[in-house]
Amino acid sequence: MTAHLKKAELHCHIEGATPPELALRQARKYGVDTSAIIRDRAYVWEDFTSFVRCYDAVASLFRTEGDYALLAETYLTELAKAGTIYSEIIVSPDHGVTIGLGADAYIEGLAAGMEAARVKTGIESRMLITGIRHLGPDSVIRTAEYAAMRRHPLVTGFNLAGEERMHSVAEFSRAFDIVRDAGLGLTIHAGELSGAFSVRDALDHVRPARISHGVRAIEDGDLVKRLADEGVVLEVCPGSNVALQVFPDFASHPLRRLYEAGVRVTLNSDDPPFFHTSLAQEYEIAFHAMGFSDSEIDRMTKTAIEAAFVDEPTREKLLAALHV
């Protein structure tokens, strides 16, 4: 059991963290029929394409600053109840623009919820602005420019998410240069739906501190060694990987092999209710299904804090809290 362990997370898409119960309440608020995406209080999808469609439908249920404050506070409060001391949420200002709320109001709403959760529970959290890969390089550059300009104290990083099989990583290098120059931490989705080559391309063209997922690096031994040698941190999401059939089961998941090869790995939930998981469940999976000991899991949590996109005083406070 891992309930007694402190936890930290670097990879969760905030709209993807919406509990079905909250989605249903939002649907009633706006008079939206959710029968195609929620059945028996669970999200319904079959493959990555239908997952994205379901995700977008859920995201459309949040339309005001107050809605987003509620979402962030709800998620982070539940994390804190499970012993989580730190969380990074992946956010998409593009969605705020699409729904007519605006990027600034979207960020401010989330920030209000994050602060409310911190006051209530003590949990620290930060936002990573994400570009959407399948919207193309020009869209991602605009998002990067916004992230570089919008210096909210809780916005500390930049990510690239979306359909990994569309566009080459090199097409997004300018966007990452923009946010790197602005001092934001860099991570990028790679090595999930695409193979080891996508991780290598990310290292070559983006030079991130972290890779979102990255698990298919296991297909290339030289790449695994490179990750270990360069100290690049992988944000690993086992429950998501099995749900999306990146790997058929936890026995075949490479987290243990990556860990033993010296790669810096962390535990994350990705889009937890969509994949019938939670951060607490990911810790349980590591313990029961993958054979990690308490001390090994603690090491992964420490890695997450060491790799977090936070200022050094906050990092020191979190490291001190890890074993309190």
UniProtKB/Swiss-Prot annotation:
Family, similarity comment: Belongs to the metallo-dependent hydrolases superfamily. Adenosine and AMP deaminases family. Adenine deaminase type 2 subfamily.
Active-site residues, record numbering mapped to chain: E192
Keyword tags: Hydrolase, Metal-binding, Nucleotide metabolism, Zinc
GO-annotated molecular function: adenine deaminase activity; zinc ion binding
GO biological process, one term: hypoxanthine salvage
Keyword Zinc attributed: yes
Free-text comment on the cofactor: Binds 1 zinc ion per subunit.
Root EC class: hydrolase
Sequence positions that bind Zn(2+): H11, H13, H189, D270
Binding-site residues for substrate, renumbered to this chain: D271
EC number(s) given by UniProt: 3.5.4.2
Cofactor: Zn(2+)
Residues of the site described as Important for catalytic activity: H213
Name of the protein in its database record: Adenine deaminase
Function per UniProt: Catalyzes the hydrolytic deamination of adenine to hypoxanthine. Plays an important role in the purine salvage pathway and in nitrogen catabolism.
Catalytic reaction equation(s): adenine + H2O + H(+) = hypoxanthine + NH4(+)
Alphabetized InterPro entries for the sequence: A_deaminase_dom, ADE, Ado/ade_deaminase, Metal_Hydrolase
